[in-house]
């Protein structure tokens, strides 16, 4: 028998501060799910943040239907090392996204060897931020 284990939003946010790998699920035009591996972080007010190319399917999907689900995992993948978050996403384009892209880079990967090079790459790749307001989390089920 499966055992329901509630996950509080604050606990999920703590998880996202430490673990930056995940799979983002968005909805295609026909309603089917589209999933993408992503690097995820947490902004200063507790929203999930993800970098993406502006031309990516996930961005187009979220502009049409902002519902998003993200399964964040640890590097070990199995066991207790995951959490699901759900919420409405918004797309933040450049230049407004640049500070958040820098913040995410520092959080997930540390200092960049050349910030001018990083900013140039973000412009060249037309990077945006997907920001998800965490409305619910989990559930976690064991068994």
Language-model features and meaning:
Residues 2-23:
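Short, basic/aromatic recognition patches
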Residues 20-21, 67, 113, 137:
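Generic structural signal for secondary-structure transition and capping sites
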Residues 1-7, 79-143:
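Charged, gly/pro-rich active-site loop segments
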Residues 19-54, 62, 69-72, 82-84:
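Short beta-strand segments
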Residues 16-17, 63-64, 123:
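Alpha-helix boundary recognition
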Residues 42, 74, 91-93:
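Short, low-complexity Ser/Thr-rich regulatory SLiMs
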């Amino acid at each position: 028998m499966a055992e329901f284990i509630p996950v509080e939003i604050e606990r999920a946010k703590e998880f996202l501060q430490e673990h930056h790998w995940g799979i983002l699920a968005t909805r295609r035009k026909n309603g089917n799910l589209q999933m993408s591996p992503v690097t995820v972080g947490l902004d200063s007010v507790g929203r999930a943040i993800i970098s993406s190319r502006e031309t990516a399917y996930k961005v187009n999907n979220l502009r049409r239907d902002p519902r998003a689900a993200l399964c964040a995992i640890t590097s070990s993948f199995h066991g207790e090392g995951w959490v699901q978050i759900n919420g409405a996403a918004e797309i933040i384009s450049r230049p407004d996204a640049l500070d958040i892209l820098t913040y995410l880079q520092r959080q997930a990967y540390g200092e960049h060897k050349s910030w001018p090079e990083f900013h140039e790459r973000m412009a060249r790749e037309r990077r945006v931020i997907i920001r998800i307001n965490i409305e619910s989390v989990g559930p976690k089920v064991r068994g």
